[in-house]
Amino acid sequence: MHYHIIGIAGAGMSAIAHILLDQGHTVSGSDVQRNALTEALEQRGALIHDGHDPAWIAGADALVATSAVRDDHVELSAARARGIPVLRRADLWREWSQQRRVVAVAGTHGKTTTTALIALMLTQAGGNPGFLIGGETPDLGIHARWGDPAAPLVVEADEYDRTFLALTPDVAVMTNVEWDHVDIYPSPDNYEAAFRLFTRRVAQPQRLIVCGDDPGALRVANHPDAQQYGIEEAIARNPASCRLAPMDWMAANVRYDGAMTNFDLWRYDRRTFGARLDGTYTMRLVGDHNVRNALAAIAVATLLGVERDAIADALAAYRGARRRFDIKGEANGITIIDDYAHHPTEARATLAAARARFPQRRLVVYLQPHTFSRTQALRDAWADAFDHADVVRIGDVYPARETGDPRTVAHALAGCIRHNDVQAVGNVVEAAATIGGLLRPGDVLLTLGAGDGYRVGELIIDTLRQQN
């Protein structure tokens, strides 16, 4: 079959394109701008069109569109006029879920890292798993693969537009649940209701892996047989949070040493009501949030029969996904890091990790807020998200699919943030010029956001290198 994909330059739709190519289908696609993801698809034989035009769907047997594509999109309208079936991401996920054993990683934060770790652990054990990951993962060489149909298909189960409800997981992870995608879910209760429905799609509750440190995850996965994971220190701070059962997978004695993290893993045996030390694990990721991501991946891989040595080797080797604490480079003694964090909780966790990694250095943070609806709804939560930063700069809002005034909303957000050095800095080019002028040797610049704010760091590092 010939599938034409609208929005093929995005992580989610390019992943679908790779799977379809693996299955032997013909793939074409269109987007407003090419990138490394479309280049990789072209190298595999996909036909990529610039911009959007009804002519691009010629010869297509089916059209695949992202949930964000408007109903009056020219290619979508042309497909319907010609009787070409229009599929959403959920339609393909549902079909694949019926063909494969699915491991689904759901949650507001941490999905990409956890999904990638599980896929890498299965691969390290000699398997050929399928996977769909929402970020480029150098250790796997690609962010989506069909793999061996007899092996599990590991899916980053995105909740946007309730797409994850198309899956019927054999194993599922719930990393955390905290209101997001406010354009789809008008209230926290509405958001949690979707996750509650997702947990019910797991046939056996003991194959549901839940973060016991997260109150939201515990609320939606309220089953005594669900396995829990968490960090000993977090449990000590909030013992009431662990109300389903003792921690089945618990990290203790977490140690950060520069770019490395070590922790001891304790496993609880529900049959003997006792815990045993499984050993010490090492990884190249920093931050408590990444310890939790690692615990979830270890739990899933163990459940799927992967030996401990393969799990430990994969965890130690994992270098992270692109745009997840992604060190872009260093120039003039200034380190520039980019992260996809676009929710206050994600930003807070990323800043804590940066402070642990660079305890003595000045931390300059640039945030490009993502969408007007999210920025407005979570404005109060942003107020205290920058406690670990020394300097905070807020860029214009990245509108994505929404309309509004990027600058006015950014200035309003900057005014709500409780910090003694916070300013709004305009668009990407203006932000790069302003921030570049205040950086000094020894600084760490951290760019945050799900849009194109990473360009601020790229522009600054190019300028610094030209000065040498």
Swiss-Prot record:
Main localisation: cytoplasm
Cell compartment(s), UniProt: Cytoplasm
Keyword Cell wall biogenesis/degradation: yes
Family note: Belongs to the MurCDEF family.
E.C. no: 6.3.2.8
Top-level taxon in the UniProt lineage: Bacteria
Protein name: UDP-N-acetylmuramate--L-alanine ligase
Manganese is among the record's keywords: no
Taxonomic classification: Bacteria, Bacillati, Chloroflexota, Chloroflexia, Chloroflexales
Listed InterPro entries: Mur-like_cat_sf, Mur_ligase_C, Mur_ligase_C_dom_sf, Mur_ligase_cen, Mur_ligase_N, MurCDEF_pg_biosynth, UDP-N-AcMur_Ala_ligase_MurC
Pathway: Cell wall biogenesis; peptidoglycan biosynthesis
Short name of one Pfam family: Mur_ligase_C
Binding site for ATP: G107, T108, H109, G110, K111, T112, T113
Gene Ontology BP terms: cell division; cell wall organization; peptidoglycan biosynthetic process; regulation of cell shape
EC class name: ligase
Organism: Roseiflexus sp. (strain RS-1)
